[in-house]
């Protein structure tokens, strides 16, 4: 099974080696056919503290690193 990759934007960088990344997805409502935007936040491990607020990043799913961290920053776009 391959790991999931998601593109998101860093919104908070106040913790050491941790960033909070916001992702946005669009889906269509089944009945009303309206486009719905879904926003989700992920707590992400930033090994070398290389990301800054506003950076667009690719995050990669990994084993649990702490109570809330299950994602790692793969690269900055």
Swiss-Prot record:
Provide the primary localization. plastid
Instruction: Check the record and name the Gene3D superfamilies matching this protein.
Output: Nucleic acid-binding proteins
Q: Where in the cell is it found?
A: Plastid, Chloroplast
Q: Which domain of life is it from?
A: Eukaryota
Pfam families listed in its UniProt record: Ribosomal_S17
One annotated GO molecular function is: structural constituent of ribosome
The record's GO CC annotations read: chloroplast; cytosolic small ribosomal subunit
Query: Which GO BP terms, alphabetically?
Result: translation
Q: Which UniProt keyword terms apply here? A: Chloroplast, Plastid, Ribonucleoprotein, Ribosomal protein, RNA-binding, rRNA-binding
Tell me the subunit arrangement.
Answer: Part of the 30S ribosomal subunit.
Q: According to its UniProt record, which protein family does this protein belong to?
A: Belongs to the universal ribosomal protein uS17 family.
PANTHER family for the chain: 40S RIBOSOMAL PROTEIN S11 FAMILY MEMBER, SMALL RIBOSOMAL SUBUNIT PROTEIN US17M
**What is the documented function of this protein?**
One of the primary rRNA binding proteins, it binds specifically to the 5'-end of 16S ribosomal RNA.
Q: Can you say what this protein is called?
A: Small ribosomal subunit protein uS17c
Organism whose genome encodes this protein: Cyanidium caldarium (Red alga)
Q: What gene makes this protein?
A: rps17
């Amino acid at each position: 099974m391959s790991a999931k990759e998601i593109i998101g934007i860093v919104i908070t960088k106040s913790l050491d080696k941790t960033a909070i990344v916001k992702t946005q997805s669009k889906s269509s409502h089944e009945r009303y056919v309206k486009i719905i935007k879904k926003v989700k936040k992920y707590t992400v491990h930033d090994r070398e503290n290389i990301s800054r607020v506003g950076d667009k990043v690719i995050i990669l799913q990994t084993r649990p690193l702490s109570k809330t961290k299950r994602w790692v920053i793969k690269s900055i776009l």
